[in-house]
Amino acid sequence: MAADYDKLFRPHEGMEAPDDMAAQPFFDPSASFPPAPASANLPKPNGQTPPPTSDDLSERFVSAPPPPPPPPPPPPPTPMPIAAGEPPSPEPAASKPPTPPMPIAGPEPAPPKPPTPPMPIAGPEPAPPKPPTPPMPIAGPAPTPTESQLAPPRPPTPQTPTGAPQQPESPAPHVPSHGPHQPRRTAPAPPWAKMPIGEPPPAPSRPSASPAEPPTRPAPQHSRRARRGHRYRTDTERNVGKVATGPSIQARLRAEEASGAQLAPGTEPSPAPLGQPRSYLAPPTRPAPTEPPPSPSPQRNSGRRAERRVHPDLAAQHAAAQPDSITAATTGGRRRKRAAPDLDATQKSLRPAAKGPKVKKVKPQKPKATKPPKVVSQRGWRHWVHALTRINLGLSPDEKYELDLHARVRRNPRGSYQIAVVGLKGGAGKTTLTAALGSTLAQVRADRILALDADPGAGNLADRVGRQSGATIADVLAEKELSHYNDIRAHTSVNAVNLEVLPAPEYSSAQRALSDADWHFIADPASRFYNLVLADCGAGFFDPLTRGVLSTVSGVVVVASVSIDGAQQASVALDWLRNNGYQDLASRACVVINHIMPGEPNVAVKDLVRHFEQQVQPGRVVVMPWDRHIAAGTEISLDLLDPIYKRKVLELAAALSDDFERAGRR
């Protein structure tokens, strides 16, 4: 069933306005005439009609009682009368002002509080520091200041000017309202104390001497480094050292001393700047009170330089008496020339620790031992590899062993070292061995070496070394004195490796045999001019020349052939040396087993070596092979010798050289 909307929204009977009321115009509140009365035939509305209200909001609150006004501020105290004899006149009590009406907007807001001064950025204002110590006068210490002088100066008491105008009353704030205007009345301000006009000012309660103004501080003069800051310091260290870069106290004292300005007796020197910490200022020293010296008159050239010129001793004392903190302040960023004294525990605790960048300590690197370059091999397959590929494989073990033998041969003997080549049987190869041994020593050592033919039975040493001169030992014995090297060199012959040889006299033309005295006459000067002397002795030990040789030599070589009888004779020679007072020669003796014939011998060489190793030191038994060049019987040349034979001769020379540092000339 559909709803009947016309019936639902139809007004009730009697609620519709009549036609004449609907035609009434809109009420105008600003009209100057009253509205027309309603017609009598209008229907009476339901309920009671509320009384008419006024549109003026101010009339609504007039009937309400106004709130009590705030209490007036208490009057200021009556000032002290300036005239001493005139009592203060009593002021009439101020009449209580009428209560002002309550404003429409509510109670009057409280007056704003004065703004709080802003907190300084650097923190609360520090307490005024103690005044710095005045400079030490030239003639002596200054008097001790009293406590009143050490106290900071009090600000002067402001005096009320005569005939000051009275403070005008502040007008009451204007409060707009739609109601009747009622001005707000404020409490009258208390009147100012009357000042007597035309009378002298009364005596003040405080001393009339007002503190003099502090002397003007000169502009801080700093070096360019101080203004720029220290480039090697961190931020923490720069904050610590502000006292040195700020206005220095010593500079101000110098300026006052140079200008001749003197402070008033009641004043004190100006305190340190507020931006500087007080803990870094040295405490004032109180010297013993003495009579103050007369202040010198200001001169043209005043200051520290003038004081040093006039009183050098006092200037030195004055410089020593100044605290280090003031000196640090004057130097600024400059480097201190003298070490500062140790600070006390308080100053050390206040000074922050310097936190600079951590520098890693670099340990000095020790120079690494560089290995010597490899020596290029001169023979064998290593030599061919280096020649074809330029790859250096170093020396072979055989070449290293040969270099070690050369190093042993090059040892320096203690004085002159003489070597005797002996044997009990002729034909064992003593002469050839002496020539080969001497040539090897001369080639390796490259110094003066002399080979003497001491065989009384027609020796041929000069023929195997190489004869160049016809002179013999007999010609040297004919000299009256052998004091120079050339006295011997004039009679010797030299081969290709610089080995000198002095042959024996010709057996066919000899008048007599050589004696031990003849040997000493030649051997003594030869030991002064030659480092090594070799003697080729004959068979046996009983001839006087061989006895003379054994009395001066330091080493001996016993030669034996590869045979049973040759080995037996070599053993007998060693026993004879031990039994006849040559034990030292027998202990250092070398045994040479010489192959004088080609082919295999009829005895075992190893058995002979084992036999002689039991009588001499290890490594002093050398087996010499048969060599074709040696068997030819001509002049011996090292280049024509077999490499094996040359190696055995080198080993013999190295074995004899081991005693160069232990045994000297006999």
Swiss-Prot record:
Residues 222-231, 357-371 have a biased composition (Basic residues). One of its GO terms (cellular component) is cytoplasmic side of plasma membrane. The lineage of its organism: Bacteria, Bacillati, Actinomycetota, Actinomycetes, Mycobacteriales. One of its GO terms (biological process) is protein secretion by the type VII secretion system. ATP binds at residues 424-431. Keywords: ATP-binding, Nucleotide-binding. InterPro entries: CobQ/CobB/MinD/ParA_Nub-bd_dom (IPR002586), P-loop_NTPase (IPR027417), ParA/MinD_ATPase (IPR050625). Disruption phenotype: Double espI-eccD1 mutants abolish EsxA and EsxB secretion, but not their expression. One group has shown no growth in the human macrophage-like cell line THP-1, no cytotoxicity, attenutated infection in mice, nearly 100-fold less bacteria in lung and spleen of C57BL/6; Brodin et al., attribute this result to polar effects on the downstream gene. Another group has shown that inactivation does not abolish EsxA (ESAT-6) secretion, EsxA-specific immunogenicity or virulence. Required to repress ESX-1-mediated secretion under low ATP conditions. This function requires the ATP-binding motif. It comes from the Bacteria. This is ESX-1 secretion-associated protein EspI. It comes from Mycobacterium tuberculosis (strain ATCC 25618 / H37Rv). Residues 1-15 have a biased composition (Basic and acidic residues). Residues 1-81 interact with EsxB while residues 35-186 interact with an artificial EsxB-EsxA heterodimer. SUPFAM superfamilies: P-loop containing nucleoside triphosphate hydrolases (SSF52540). Residues 1-378 are annotated as: Disordered. Residues 22-31 have a biased composition (Low complexity).
